[in-house]
Amino acid sequence: MSLACSRSLFFMAFTAGILALGASYYLEYAVGLVPCSLCLVQRLFMSVLTLCCGLAAVHGPQRVGLSLYWMVTLLSSLGGTTAAWRQVLFQSDSLQELAHCAPNPEEMFSSLPWLCALMRMFNDTADCAELSWTLFDLSIPEWSLLFFVGMSILAVYQLLRQVWMALQRPLSGQPSHPALVRD
């Protein structure tokens, strides 16, 4: 029962990620919105999250594999939450305080080491502070933040559930705590 439940949760998270990525590409190519550097970072984390959930749904791992997949999901959703939160903060700042020239991601990654390029993408730029599109009075980074926070909550809940199940039924078949002998 637990395996089927985990596979369906991974499949639902995979489907939500595909829909979110599809919406971002639709807004870029059909509507004409140009993504800023933080949007590209959020897409990267969302792609990792979606790929991880898709692999887990197909793979159907057991106890240790489930924990690893949920951990990767949690880490990628926390990275996306950080990028989305940073962009939401940029949108609340005044544009005069932000740098006016946004770094080109292709040039940065070709000329700088990866870590330096990622750090530079988190600098204040006016491109990331523009409110170009809203739905229900929420901007794209706010929707992205809601998605990543939801995925983080799901991953934390599933990891805590895995820990609880491991305490109740360890791999050896013996309870790990005397209070759980009643089982």
UniProtKB/Swiss-Prot annotation:
GO terms for molecular function: electron transfer activity; protein-disulfide reductase activity. GO terms for biological process: protein folding. Residues 1-9, 62-68, 162-183 are cytoplasmic. It comes from the Bacteria. GO terms for cellular component: plasma membrane. It is found in: Cell inner membrane. Pfam families: DsbB. The chain crosses the membrane at residues 10-26, 45-61, 69-85, 143-161. Coiled coil: none annotated. Residues 27-44, 86-142 are periplasmic. Disulfide bonds join C36-C39, C101-C128. Keywords: Cell inner membrane, Cell membrane, Chaperone, Disulfide bond, Electron transport, Membrane, Oxidoreductase, Redox-active center, Transmembrane, Transmembrane helix, Transport. PANTHER family: DISULFIDE BOND FORMATION PROTEIN B (PTHR36570:SF3). Required for disulfide bond formation in some periplasmic proteins. Acts by oxidizing the DsbA protein. This is Disulfide bond formation protein B 2. It comes from Pseudomonas fluorescens (strain Pf0-1). The lineage of its organism: Bacteria, Pseudomonadati, Pseudomonadota, Gammaproteobacteria, Pseudomonadales.
